[in-house]
Amino acid sequence: HADRAIEAVIQAFGLAGARIGTLIADARIVSLLRSVLPPYAIAQPCIEAAQQALAPAQQRLARERVAAIVRERARLSAALAGLAGVTHVWPSDANFLLVEFDEPARALSRLREARLLVRDFRDRPGLERALRITVGSPEQNDRLVRSLAC
């Protein structure tokens, strides 16, 4: 839908909590939004943070972080797929993986014992055996895989 494409400034720039983004939309939608937004809808500290985060040097760092996450996501996905008890790892373009386990409660218990937090998706229809695992550093991901391999 070309008239409703919304693009947020992503976490790669370290601005997830700044509530800054862009809107690409039909002129009528933009006009409507402008009519309801306060005159200073974005706080000055947020504007300054965005300007700093989007500077060329910071953009290079963000691209490097994204590349590292992509590499680590592929490595973690392969490691998880090779574990006994993992029945499916969904493909992902995000910084997390959705993983199905034959015994998700057991996997969750092991991860909690290791003081590793994951998102429990078992209460969602069709995902009754799934946990969402955020891609961490290589060391964090190795620890996660070791915890599940026991």
Predicted features along the sequence, with ranges:
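Conserved PLP-binding catalytic core of the aspartate aminotransferase-like
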Residues: 69-70, 74, 80-114
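PLP-dependent aminotransferase class I/II
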Residues: 9-82
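Short, acidic/turn-prone active-site loops that include or flank metal/cofactor-
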Residues: 8-11, 123-125
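Active-site phosphate-binding strand-loop segment of PLP-dependent enzymes
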Residues: 1-2
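Short hydrophobic/aromatic beta-strand micro-patches
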Residues: 24, 98-100, 134-136
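Short acidic/glycine-enriched loop/turn segments that link adjacent beta-strands
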Residues: 17, 93-94, 125-129
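PLP-dependent enzyme catalytic core of the Aspartate aminotransferase-like
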Residues: 113-114, 123-150
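A short linear hydrophobic-aromatic micro-motif
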Residues: 5, 85-88, 116-122
